[in-house]
Swiss-Prot record:
PROSITE patterns: MAPK, PROTEIN_KINASE_DOM, PROTEIN_KINASE_ST. The modification Phosphotyrosine is found at residue 192. The TXY motif contains the threonine and tyrosine residues whose phosphorylation activates the MAP kinases. The modification Phosphoserine is found at residues 186-187. The modification Phosphothreonine is found at residue 190. This is Mitogen-activated protein kinase 4. Its cofactor is Mg(2+). InterPro entries: Kinase-like_dom_sf, MAP_kinase, MAP_kinase_CS, Prot_kinase_dom, Ser/Thr_kinase_AS. GO terms for molecular function: ATP binding; MAP kinase activity; metal ion binding; protein serine kinase activity; protein serine/threonine kinase activity. It catalyses: L-seryl-[protein] + ATP = O-phospho-L-seryl-[protein] + ADP + H(+); L-threonyl-[protein] + ATP = O-phospho-L-threonyl-[protein] + ADP + H(+). It is an enzyme of class 2 (transferase).
Amino acid sequence: MTQLVPLAELPSGKKIYSVRGQRFEVDRQYDLVKVVGFGACGTVCSAVVNGSGERVAIKRLSRVFGDLREGKRILREMEIMTSLKHNNLIRLHHFMRPQSKETFEDIYLVMDLYDTDLNRIIRSRQKLTDEHLQYFMIQAFRGLHYLHSAKVMHRDLKPSNLLVNADCALAICDFGLARDDQVMSSSDLTQYVVTRWYRPPEVLGMGSNQYTSAVDVWSLGLIFAELMVGRALLPGTDYIGQLVMIVNLLGSPSIDDMEFLSSEAKAFILSQPHRPALSFRDLFPMATEEATDLLSKLLVFHPARRLTAKQVMEHPYFSKYRDAAEEADAPDPFVWNHSHIETKEQLREDLWRVVEAHSQLNE
């Protein structure tokens, strides 16, 4: 495999690469191999550790002080990764220590490297057995239960955020949108929300204030369905279209089931023709009865009536893969200690403290 070639090596020992036209600066013991992921929030490269040959992923979070809200989001992601340790959550090795507190603009995370993700597996159209589905989904719900028991909700679960190795080991990644597990106001999700196809009714409710950890259960339910059929189950093109697709699938909700929606969302649904619920047994004829029974308890219109992640793991569908040690609660709730940040100077100080505390020098 052709590796990326460094452009220069600084006296400090840092290697400089050009990755997708941007400067990528890593410690001398790492050789970058290739880009494995990129987006608005950062770029991820695979790398090899000199000497040991260990393969890792290095994520560059760029221009962390460009926007205060975005910087606080990045800080939250970093704090969650340093605080929560579980086999089904991506493991952070350490942060690379910048040369100067006063001048650093980017943050580099060294993490476990995975071979692929569920999005690539689904798009490859490779044949998945029911055992594959059981094993993937029990791991996803183990990781999710651990997050929820730490009072954190992910809020952006989608197939590309579920990483997979050749041995089918799975880990949840990308905690950039994660928040404390509490009822959120609609304004909290205005800028950052679950990718549309995986949004539950309460996020599409146009004014609903009932955002809880149940949003993650809905998202994993849709991923489960996607694994069954090899395509997105609800590929809506906008908010209204997404809500219509949900109603077409689950049937027209009762007045009680719409109690969490805004008046506008309720009025829209009531203006539509009444729809009966579709049969999951007919929609997924290849699936077992236990699989469709579980799915029917995940894709529930009212968030309070969905199973919790803990209840999901107790479902008979997963009886073969139950493991009490992997299903334990987090020892402590996640605590966000940075509510005081109101300036970029305060953000710089707190980011530096976290990076220093978890840099390789302090491992």
